[in-house]
C-alpha cells in the first residue's frame, strides 16, 4: 500500500522537474539527450573526479589548484547553464556560449600554467595579463547570473564600483585602479581565489559529490519510510512525517527548494488528504526542508566555510549545531501537533504505513553517515578524506540490495550529478570572495562596523536586530553561501566586538541567511511548496514563517546564552537552557496557533507568548516568570477543557 502511495504521488507530481526549474535557479540547466548527454555527463564526471583529487591527493601550489578548479567550473558551468532559462532547445549550445566557455576557462588556465612567473612579478602586470583577468571575471559574472541569479551580481558590482572609486579617486590612481583591482581580485588570494573557493576546493565539493552518492543509494526513500513508522499514526501524522523526513533528507540534498519538491511530492498530498489546509501543508514542507541546511552532520555549504572563518574543526561546528537544530525542528513539530489537535486530525491508518521489519532491514543505508560522523569526530582524517571514505562506504553498502546497487553506470550518474551540483556553489564562492576582497582592501568592512555601532548606540539587541534584517534582505536574492561570506566579513566582527562569542555570532548570521527561503516576499521554498499544494503562495509563505518562528528566536538565544552552542558551559547549564527553551517554544507555538485543549482567548495568547519568550531569555527570574505564565495558561486551559467535557 505504501509503495502504491509513493508511486501515485510521483505520478501526480511528475512535473517536479518543472517546479524545480521554476523555483530553483540551479535546476535551470540545458537539456542534453542521447550522445551529447553522454559526452556532457562524461565531462561533468571527469570534473567530479578532479575535484575529488584536489581534495584527497593534490599537493600543488594553491594558485595552481584553485585556478585549475575554477577553470574547470567555467567549462562545466557553461555546458550546464543556458543564457536564458525560457529558451532552452534540446542538444543546443549557441556559439557565443562556446566562446565564453573557452575564453573564461582559458583565462584561469593561463594563470594556472604560468602561476610561478605571475606570482613572482606581482603586483606588476602586463597589459595583456590585465585583459586576461578582465575576461575571466566577465565570464565568471555571466556564469554567476545563470547559475545563482542577478542579485549577487548586483551586490558584487556595487562593491567593485566602490573599490574602483576608492583606488581611482580617493587614492588618486585614476585608470590604474583597474590594474590594482584585477591584481587583487583575480591574481592574489584576496578575491576570487580567497577563503570561500579554497574551502570549496578543499572539502565542500567532495561533500556535494558524497551527497549525490547518498541520494542515489536510496537513503531518501528510507528516511521517508522511517518518518512514517515513527510519526505516521499520531495525530496529524503526515505533517509530522514531513517534518522528520524533510529534516533527514534536507541534510543530504542541501537545497531548500530541491528538498521541498522531492519530499513534498509525497508528503503534501498526504497532509491535504488528512485535513490540513493546502497553504499549511505547503508551509510545513517548506519550513522543514529549509531547516535541512542546519541539520548535522551534513549541513549547508556555508557551514563548511565557518570552519575556515573560525579556524575550528568541522566536528566542533557539527557538535555546536545540534542543540539549535533540535530546537528549530522541535518548534515546527509543536506547531504541527497543535494544529492537528485544533482541527481534530487523525494519523495515517497503520495498514497504509510501510511494514516495520522490511524497513528496519534497510537501516544499513545509514552506515555511510555513521562512518562519516565517526571519522570527522575522531579527527582521524581531513574532512575531504573523510568524505572520500564515506563515498566508498556508500558504494559498498549499496551492494546489499539490488534496486539500490550502485553499478558502474549509476556511479557515473552520481559523479555527473555531483559535478553539476558543484557549479553553483563554486561560482557563489568565487563571487563571495570578490565581495569579501572589496570589503577588506578598501576598509569598507570597518566603516560598516562603525555604522552599525553608531545606529545601535552600542546596544547588543539593536545590533543583532539590524544584522538579522541585513541577512534576510541579502538572503532573498543571494545564495546562502555568499550571504554568509558577506555577513561573516561585515556584521559578525561587529557582534564579536560587542562581546558575543565568535561561534555564536557566525551561527547568528548563518541562520538568518537561510530563513530567507521562507520569508516573504521572496520565499522560494514556500512558493515551491504552494505550487505542489495548489495554495496561495503568499499565505503559504506567511504560514511557513510562522511555523519556523524558532529560526527567528534560536539565534538570539545563541547570542545571549552561548551555552546553546556549548561555549563556556557545563552539562547542567545546557540541560537547563534546553528545557527552558523547549517550554518557551511551546508557549510561543501555542500563542501563534491559538489552541491548546480548546481555543485560547487573545489575552491568554499574549500571556503565554510573553511567558514563552521570557523563558528563552537567560536568567532565573525570567525563567520563573515564564514558567508561571506558560504553566498558568496551560493549567487554565486543561482544567477548563475538563469541565467542558464533564458538562
Predicted regions and their residues:
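Conserved, well-structured core domains of diverse proteins
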Residues: 1-120, 130-134
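Long, contiguous bundles of hydrophobic transmembrane helices that form the permeation core
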Residues: 2-38, 319-421, 524-613, 641-646
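Membrane-water interface regions at transmembrane-helix termini and the short interhelical loops
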Residues: 29, 54-59, 81-91, 117-118, ...
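Hydrophobic or amphipathic alpha-helical targeting/insertion segments
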Residues: 95-98, 104-108, 113-117, 124-125, ...
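Membrane-interfacial loop-to-helix junctions in multi-pass transporters
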Residues: 127-131, 190-203, 229-243, 274-280, ...
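Core transmembrane alpha-helical segments of multi-pass membrane transporters/permeases
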Residues: 142, 146-147, 155-171, 178-179, ...
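Transmembrane alpha-helix interface/packing and boundary motifs in multi-pass membrane proteins
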Residues: 211-215, 246-255, 287-293, 436, ...
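Hydrophobic transmembrane alpha-helices that form the pore/transport pathway of multi-pass ion
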Residues: 224-292, 298, 302-305, 311, ...
